[in-house]
Amino acid sequence: MRATLFAGFAVLAVVAATAVTPASAQTTGGISITHGGNNLNTAKGKFSEADQAVTTLAGSASRHGKVVTNGGRNTNTALGKFSFAGQDVTTIGGDASGRGRVFTNGGLNTNTARGFASSATQSIATLGGSAFGNGRSITNGGHNTNLAAGRFSSADQQVVTLGGTAGRHGLNVVSGGNNRNAALGFGSSASQQVFTGGQ
């Protein structure tokens, strides 16, 4: 997998993972549910290459808290000529206690590279928030699409979404935007960086 996919985001994932929760669900009188994403990976023509790395880490729930972590819908495709399509998705669940509810969705993620000399990279990291005292924290990692279709195309996208904190019947909703990144025609190039942080 190309190193560019992991720059910055791998560091974020490791730091967040150690800070928030270990790789397994932590439950002490709570419920933690984790879905690892739908993941699809395709590479077809010529010098095509489609890489995909998806990591989903469960959150922690205690004292009747509930944590639901969904690792995104992830799709990755590279079809023609000198195509390359990367994709790196990391979703880390949040922390719920005292009847708090935390929902973390890793975005809808799609990554495509189609035609001649195309290249599309995508990196998405979604970190769930925390909730306690009947609070609810909802974090959505954006709708994310990344495309490079024709000629000398190249498209780059990086999205980070950090959830917030909800306490005492509070509600905290963080959505990482509707993100779309495209480079379509002759000599095209497109780059996008999105950061969304809750409190």
Give the residues covered by each predicted segment.
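Low-complexity repeat regions of mature extracellularly deployed or surface/particle-associated proteins
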Residues: A23-Q199
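Bacterial N-terminal signal peptides that target proteins for export
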Residues: M1-A10
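C-terminal segment of classical bacterial N-terminal signal peptides
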Residues: V14-A23
